[in-house]
Each structure stands twice: as structure tokens, then as C-alpha cells.
């Protein structure tokens, strides 16, 4: 971690680890599972043998609550909900199953429409094709 802080320093930035260090100190190293960057942690998917970088749950669950100005409110909300569900697919399958249903049900209740969403494995396949092929 200290090499990251040094590299940021050469660019005129001050790197602060997400834990804010102990007494302002940045640890020399940490396991990748202990690192968080821009609200993303790292987890290894043993079944697929790949690393994922899931966004923190609080951020994902906030996504449907916001809509950019200039967008149709329903279409903007739909896109945010679908993006939130895609982000959920980088978490464990049980997390995806639980929260994707909650989000889709809430959207359907509010609009009478359903989201265009993929399955857990479908999102994994999309990522594989996009990043590894």
C-alpha cells in the first residue's frame, strides 16, 4: 500500500486508504480481500475461478433512489434499477437472488412494468465475454 501512496504522491495526490490508516499511516501491504477502492472490494469466485470487484451493498441499494435530470423519470429509474441488479451479480448468488427480486418487485409495484434483467449466470457470462474474450 505504501507504493501506491508514493505513486500517487508523484502525481500530486495524497492517497488515503479506505480505513484512513492508524494515526494517518498507510499499511505496507494487505491481502487483496482486505482492499477496497472506490467502494469496491475484491472477492474470488471459486466456482468460476475469477476475481470479482463487487460494489458495496449500500451504494447498490441507493442506486434506484436517484435519477439524473433531463431523463424521463421512469426510464431513468428503470436504468438505475437494472444497473443495480447487474452490480448485485458480482456478489454471491444468494445476495443477487434476494435483492434482485426486491428491486424488481418494487419497480413493478410503482410502475406496473418489470425490469429487463438477466440471471446471475447470465451476467457472469456477459462479463466473461466482455473482459476475457
Predicted regions located by residue number:
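Active-site and adjacent loop segments of nucleotide-processing enzymes
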Residues: 2-6, 10-14, 19, 24-133
